[in-house]
Amino acid sequence: MRHYEVVFLVHPDQSEQVPAMIERYRGLIEENGGAIHRLEDWGRRQLAYLINKVHKAHYILMNIECDQETLKELENLFYYNDAVLRDMFIKRNEAVTEPSVMASQKEDKRRGDK
């Protein structure tokens, strides 16, 4: 199985459905023998440019391990889901488990660090 980094942007009006979407994608990956090594919900953030007349989106990052068929199925789910504004799949050489820069910045703000 291969490792992938997946980032997808959800329409801000659908933010309350994000946990259910994550569980559906998690179920698909795990039922086909894959694993999620890192899952981060970056929350609602400003976009650099308008996408479908929307200036904010809900960002989700997942590092997954799955086979090619599962990846294609996941790509199709994103493609046909109107709530997903953009998605990006990057092939990785190994599993990434440490927190991303975005998550560590969010944690620093919570603690009051600069």
Swiss-Prot record:
It comes from the Bacteria. The keyword Ribosomal protein applies. One of its GO terms (cellular component) is cytosolic small ribosomal subunit. This is Small ribosomal subunit protein bS6. GO terms for molecular function: small ribosomal subunit rRNA binding; structural constituent of ribosome. Transmembrane segments: none annotated. Binds together with bS18 to 16S ribosomal RNA. It holds the Pfam family Ribosomal_S6. HAMAP family: Ribosomal_bS6. Belongs to the bacterial ribosomal protein bS6 family. The keyword Ribosomal protein applies. Keywords: Ribonucleoprotein, Ribosomal protein, RNA-binding, rRNA-binding.
